[in-house]
Amino acid sequence: MHIHVLGSAAGGGFPQWNCNCPNCDGLRKGTIKAKKRTQSSICVSADGINWVLFNTSPDILQQIQEFAPLQPGRAIRDTGVVGIVLIDAQIDHTTGLLMLREGQVKREIYCTDMVYQDLTTGNPLLNILDHYCGVNRHDIPIDGKHSFSVEHAPGLRFTAVALKSAAPPYSPHRHDPHPGDTIGVLIEDLNNGKKAFYAPGLGEIEPHLPALMEQADCIMVDGTFWTDTEMLDMGLMSKKARDIGHNPQSGPGGMMEVLDGYPGARRVLIHINNTNPILREDSAERVELTRRGIEVAYDGMDIIL
């Protein structure tokens, strides 16, 4: 299995266009040791030819241009993307669908009922695409027991589970959570049995998750915030990290503590907010992650399982 990180930042990217926090300001001025990052998305393949795209960020065109296998150039119109799996309906995970509207071939989109509802009502991107390329929508089972496959992506099997998290702010049921608003996915390579667990919007470790995470050779999870009060402390938001569906890395029950329970797996944080000190490669927080064997995803990162 080849996992390629197209984008590793949370919504807004890094640096964020309107932000002058120490990280964003420092990156622009070249006074901190850090890498620019686009908004989070990965693609996965078992054969290096047919790729499944997870989420479509607003930066998707740049991300495709920077990863050659997604444009193999076999015909006058071509793509290496054979299917798109949407983890949720968040703006930073779905806006890129509009950038993929060209062509006569329908987009093969895999999503839950709740995500489909949001993308045909509150933010009707799929309705818009029907006037361009069109969409073949495939349902994703979320009970953790029934797997699904993506046509034309041989050698891969996917098992999804519902995660406790918040629907997007635009969603008609923003304050009435439903199973399927956000999912985590166990990705299995049927050729060698290797597995990866991908959950960029993991707000809470629920009882049904350890059984899936224990199977994974690689765990890629929510790296949005370092502390629960990160945005509060900077005066940027009136809510805590957990209030908006993100489990911070530090503190009791935080993501570091969770990942410590899976020492045999490769552990990677993705979907990192521009305020998070782990973006600074020489920060004390980054040193602590390294000490624990936890990696920080970056654009262009390749994981081979």
Curated annotation (Swiss-Prot):
A biological-process GO annotation: pyrroloquinoline quinone biosynthetic process
Family to which the UniProt record says this protein belongs: Belongs to the PqqB family.
InterPro entries for the chain: Metallo-B-lactamas (IPR001279), PQQ_synth_PqqB (IPR011842), RibonucZ/Hydroxyglut_hydro (IPR036866)
Functional summary from the UniProt entry: May be involved in the transport of PQQ or its precursor to the periplasm.
Record-given protein name: Coenzyme PQQ synthesis protein B
SUPFAM superfamilies: Metallo-hydrolase/oxidoreductase
Classification via NCBIfam families: PQQ_syn_pqqB
Domain of life: Bacteria
HAMAP family: PQQ_syn_PqqB
Organism: Methylobacillus flagellatus
Pathway: Cofactor biosynthesis; pyrroloquinoline quinone biosynthesis
Keywords: PQQ biosynthesis, Transport
